[in-house]
Amino acid sequence: MYLVSLDAGTNMYFKVTGILLTITVGLVTGSFLDRKDLFKILLRDYQKDLAPAGKGGGPVVVYHSLFVNAFESLENNVLTLQTWEWMSWNDNRLQWDLGSYGDEKTLIIPSKLVWQPDILLMNSVEQFTGFAAGDLNVLVYHDGNVTFVPIRHSKTLCPFSMESIYRENEVNCSLKYMSWTHSSKTLDTHSTFQTVQHLSQMTPNRLWEIVDTKAERNAIDVLVLQHRSISRN
């Protein structure tokens, strides 16, 4: 994402894992009783703490994107944004036959009742308060596809110096998202789009302007090392 300073001619490059926000809702033709029965059947033996399996028993594929709602600030090496975080995946435990429930194509379920991917902004400067807002809903389709769009207020570490701005006329910031506990064997993350999308009514910033964007997917191996210091009493 390129950000240009409106008063100093400064460009900023901002790399994100993805951006999108488009929800397609099918026409609801069933009755309340159909939805009530479907709700009970789907969640009766459902285990929300167990991740769904992907195709052929492989990892569940999570499509992840961001949608910028407001560009609040870039100061003190911190980029502050208001975003809608779009996530979608398939959970085969949440499938149903259309003909059995009044042709219900979708069902709205509280997000706290179903499995959610533990995807975090890894270079956030804020204290961790939870993976997602439990009072938001997910949209479940009859084929098991799930769409979840929580609202985020993110503060991301973006190191830069005024000398580098004057010398290179740009700043490079990255938003890095990944699963906190899953490896690629159980959860595979994909970016839906290669560019960042913005809400048409996005609140602009007085000093900076977004002029270009980019999204990348990277596969990395993470090695966790523990160091302990022991002193004699």
Predicted regions and their residues:
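Classical eukaryotic N-terminal signal peptides for Sec-dependent ER targeting/secretion
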Residues: 1-22
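Non-transmembrane, solvent-exposed beta-strand/loop segments in proteins
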Residues: 24-233
